[in-house]
């Protein structure tokens, strides 16, 4: 009887070790190495490729030379929303949010270019790709905050003095944040910016009052991001690291004030010199 108890405990321990060890490789799967059927309904399409944790190389760069960036991928992992305090003596702080959007939060297939000036300042210019995703997070109190996760027209620069792309380089810059809703979007009362009703109240004289959200707008916001390179593979031109982005949330076509949203995650890209 005692032997059977020890055997069951030993088997349970082995099963736990196997489960723990199997979690590592599962997270390191490269979606580019899988077929459509292997990715379908698994969430792997939302994962960015990864580089080995032991990769610590560098990619030499020269002033006046242009380098292309392909397959830039940003995978968000943490979300925070700036919440105003109830007490005026307290300061506003970021509250963690729970992701409600499934499997469609990563930015990928983004392309751009990198230039280097005489002072060793490395500049990254974002040019295009799947560079936006509508995302919604929920705060602990139940409030839902939608925002337009993007890095459109990002211009990120480093400190001077770099002659290579290595694990100590950090791109920081600003980008545009388009409106979460388009000009032809209609609200539940059929009102829009370029189409739909002008107002949805009984008295036309009150149609321009902001309290009724009749005046629709599609404002362009501004965000900032920091791309910190932590891994570089000189042989393949691959780089990877972590990012920290801050941007405004949705304004419901100008009906409410935006709140600040902070997104943290990992990124991956390939750098090649101009032919």
Swiss-Prot record:
GO terms of biological process kind? photosystem II assembly; photosystem II stabilization
Per UniProt, which keywords does this protein have?
A: Manganese, Membrane, Photosynthesis, Photosystem II, Signal, Thylakoid
SUPFAM superfamilies the UniProt entry points to: OMPA-like
Which InterPro entries does this one have? OMP/PagP_b-brl (IPR011250), PsbO (IPR002628)
User: Its Gene Ontology molecular function terms?
Assistant: oxygen evolving activity
Which region is the signal sequence? 1-28
Per the record, the domain of life is Bacteria
Q: Where in the cell is it found?
A: Cellular thylakoid membrane
What Gene3D superfamilies does the entry give? photosynthetic oxygen evolving center domain, Photosystem II, cytochrome c-550 precursor
Record keyword Signal present = yes
How this chain sits in the membrane, per its record, is: Peripheral membrane protein
Q: Name one GO cellular component term.
A: photosystem II oxygen evolving complex
Main location group: membrane
Q: Which residues form a coiled coil?
A: none
Tell me, what does this protein do in biology? One of the extrinsic, lumenal subunits of photosystem II (PSII), which stabilize and protect the oxygen-evolving complex. PSII is a light-driven water plastoquinone oxidoreductase, using light energy to abstract electrons from H(2)O, generating a proton gradient subsequently used for ATP formation. Required for dimerization of PSII and for binding of PsbQ to PSII.
Oligomeric state and interaction partners are given as: PSII is composed of 1 copy each of membrane proteins PsbA, PsbB, PsbC, PsbD, PsbE, PsbF, PsbH, PsbI, PsbJ, PsbK, PsbL, PsbM, PsbT, PsbX, PsbY, PsbZ, Psb30/Ycf12, peripheral proteins PsbO, CyanoQ (PsbQ), PsbU, PsbV and a large number of cofactors. It forms dimeric complexes.
Q: To which protein family does this belong? A: Belongs to the PsbO family.
Name used for this protein in its record = Photosystem II extrinsic protein O
Origin species, per record, is Crocosphaera subtropica (strain ATCC 51142 / BH68)
Q: Which gene encodes it?
A: psbO
